[in-house]
């Protein structure tokens, strides 16, 4: 049983990076597809579409920082909290990345037809980013209370 707890602990240490990267990749792909379509339909301003499509990549950065904050010798005593925090924040980053990609795709679609709303169209993506920040901050706070 102790070995399983240690294995799960190590899984929890790496989960934020893996799941954050997965969410970022899916989100960037969704927004990137919208950017490619928008570039076909507009004459200029391609850089803003590409820039917006990169917004979901922040989730993997949060995952990397969380991984470093969780990194320690994994024991049967701290394996369960490491697994719980790491896997739950990883799942949050996964979903935020996907939904942020969708929000960015919508912003791209809206602003290609009406460029003057570009900044406002990004607001939903920024709001979704806030949930990643909440998960990130709470994971950092909880990671500090896990015994080494």
Can you annotate each of these PLM segments?
Residues 1-148:
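Hydrophobic, small-residue-rich transmembrane alpha-helices and their short perimembrane loops
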């Amino acid at each position: 049983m102790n070995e399983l707890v240690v294995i799960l602990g190590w899984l929890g240490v790496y989960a934020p990076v893996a799941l954050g990267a997965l969410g970022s990749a899916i989100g960037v792909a969704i927004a990137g597809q919208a950017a490619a379509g928008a570039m076909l339909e507009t004459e200029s301003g391609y850089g803003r579409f590409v820039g917006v499509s990169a917004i979901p990549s922040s989730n993997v950065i949060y995952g990397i920082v969380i991984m470093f904050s969780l990194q320690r010798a994994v024991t049967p005593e701290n394996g369960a909290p490491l697994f719980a925090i790491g896997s739950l924040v990883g799942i949050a980053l996964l979903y935020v990345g996907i939904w942020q990609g969708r929000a960015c795709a919508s912003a791209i679609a809206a602003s290609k037809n009406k460029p003057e709303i570009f900044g406002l169209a990004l607001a939903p993506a920024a709001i979704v980013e806030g949930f990643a920040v909440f998960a990130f901050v709470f994971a950092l706070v909880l990671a500090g209370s896990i015994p080494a």
